[in-house]
Amino acid sequence: MSTQTILPVDRETVAALSSRKNEPAWLAEFRLQALEKAATLDYPKLEKTKIERWNLDSYGTHADAAEAKSFADVPAEARGFLNEDGAQDMDNVLVQHNSGVVYRRLNAELAAKGIIFTDLETAVREHEALVKPYLMQALKADEHRMAALHAALWNGGAFLYVPKNVEVDIPLQALFYTDNAQATFAPHVLIVAEANSRVSYMDNYVSGQLQAPIVHNGVVEVFVKPGAKVTYASIHHLGEQATDVTFRRAVVENDGRIEWIVGEMHNGNAASETNSILEGNGSTSDAKIICVGNGEQKLNITTKAVHVGKSSDSQMITRAVMRESASSIINGITKIEKGATKANGEQTERVLMLSPKARGDANPILLIDEDDVTAGHAASAGQVNQEQVFYMMSRGISREDAENLIIRGFLAPVVAEVPNEYLQQLLKSYIERKLGQ
């Protein structure tokens, strides 16, 4: 049973946050109620990981961000994560620096189609009718303590709305950047894609030189209406001082589709859940996730699909590389509810360990309450295949190069799916760095 707990923030701090942001009364009250719930809720229960032993108290305080008048005013280090020279002006981009969004720009052509792409704080005030029905609905504030604390403290974030029958040909992009461990960093991403719309969105979570521990408690909610398709690509590359906890949820209606492409490249402890709730008949999801661990890192990565609709289909691939003394728990969960006839769920989890001290655990889980369905899983955890290494060495390739080629090929199916060439190259550089190359 849960007991009353001392929280990292108090009621006065949360109330002051709402007041400073001039939030509507319903949101101010919602934040306070969430904080009260947090005091009595447990931390999320993760397979084979005691997250409560991690540093989960370093939230800091909200620090107002100075608005950037132009892209050149965005911190130089942050700009470098968006384009190669870090100077070129960019459309369809949003940048959060520590506790608030400092830059947002949507080109006139997309705005004329009714697309909204702005920070969530602004969206709450200017597009309340579009935000209120969805905020903290895919992930409820009373699910666990991390969800409740996020609901009480979220800041900045992104809101993307795509009207019915509108197709967006270019990906929209957000950067969430923290370099101050004393500033609360808890962005919330909310995407609503109306019927028969199409959109690609990608974001990058990065940190500068953090001088003290910090918690990133992030939530992503995606609502895919009938016949719509959303592609969501995300790379996390926070520093060793950061504890990264992220919950991603998509609710997919009839014939809708969600595609997840995720690179978990953290340097500190990290836990993430990427969950597709296939509510509609004919709804589909595809999740491709990679992670690389090194040092003393502890990672818990969960990919999940919940089938509610008939003839729904989920595909999940998770690949992890562990080196040095890193450890990972890789969970794949397919849940098929009663009544979800003709549903199909397939999942694969593979862990590659590069040192004797590295640890990896691949856990395929099938929870099936309906007879007329198909489901499958494959899982493996082990060292680099030495037969492959020897074969390449017999062709004149050194052992080190052979192992590197195998690792790159192992991760390639996800890297190749990132819908932006520069971000794809950035992900490759993160991988090379984490592998010590």
Name each region found by the language model.
Residues 2-148, 317-323:
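N-terminal amphipathic, basic helical "cap/leader" segment at the start of enzyme domains
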